[in-house]
Amino acid sequence: MKKTQRKEIENVTNITGVRQIELWRRDDLQHPRLDEVAEEVPVALVYNGISHVVMMASPKDLEYFALGFSLSEGIIESPRDIFGMDVVPSCNGLEVQIELSSRRFMGLKERRRALAGRTGCGVCGVEQLNDIGKPVQPLPFTQTFDLNKLDDALRHLNDFQPVGRLTGCTHAAAWMLPSGELVGGHEDVGRHVALDKLLGRRSQEGESWQQGAVLVSSRASYEMVQKSAMCGVEILFAVSAATTLAVEVAERCNLTLVGFCKPGRATVYTHPQRLSN
């Protein structure tokens, strides 16, 4: 049998994060064809010269990712704690070089962990199980959301996934206004990274978290809940299911968690008092 070698083609699309490669279909193994595949690269977040975490991510909107990660992990309290940021190539991927305030950097050094995650993984590298959970202040109850507005948002979620439409390989996170309109959506090969990009962008733009909800195309893990709550998000909608730990965290921090979101369908796990129908 003749050996074949996979051939990678120069990126000929206009979309960052997509590359064309040569591949074979099941019904025609004799003739290769070109198809689009989502890029996944190691991204190191380097604070004041010290590498803190390496995540696998899509190579775009990395400044938003770094800001959102810093906020949702409790490294900073506001975007003002970051004095500067640069994205630079490294030997095997990309580095986001972040200049923290002295006070925040001292706090980071006290709890620093070496983390090398798989795609969007935020638990890998934690030294003890007790370190997984982060203290989250209970959220206020400032709004109600009409579930009838959810259906239109679900139909438009993939508008924020240009890479996903080409490759079938990304998750999306978007902000949903009370009207059901989606604004400020982001995509990534990692669901946690997509959420961090959304959190970072809205925080940088000074947007309120109290008039609307986050909608994600993935399941709702405990970390998705925790990241949302750390930034003040009161309602999280997920297209897929929630885990038991996600439900426990949502209950504890007063976050309204909704899963299995499809047109005409939704499962409310916690705090339904924020919802109407």
From Swiss-Prot:
GO terms for biological process, alphabetical: Mo-molybdopterin cofactor biosynthetic process
Gene Ontology terms for molecular function: sulfur carrier activity; sulfurtransferase activity
Higher taxonomy: Bacteria, Pseudomonadati, Pseudomonadota, Gammaproteobacteria, Enterobacterales
Catalytic site: C121
Disulfide bond annotation, renumbered to this chain: none
Entries under PANTHER family matching the protein: FORMATE DEHYDROGENASE, SULFUR CARRIER PROTEIN FDHD
Organism for this UniProt entry: Shigella flexneri
Keyword Cytoplasm on entry: yes
Family from the record: Belongs to the FdhD family.
Entry function: Required for formate dehydrogenase (FDH) activity. Acts as a sulfur carrier protein that transfers sulfur from IscS to the molybdenum cofactor prior to its insertion into FDH.
Protein name: Sulfur carrier protein FdhD
UniProt entry keywords in alphabetical sequence: Cytoplasm, Molybdenum cofactor biosynthesis
Subcellular location, record wording: Cytoplasm
Predominant localisation class: cytoplasm
GO CC, any one term: cytoplasm
Gene3D superfamilies: 3.10.20.10, Cytidine Deaminase, domain 2
Binding of Mo-bis(molybdopterin guanine dinucleotide), residues: F260, C261, K262, P263, G264, R265
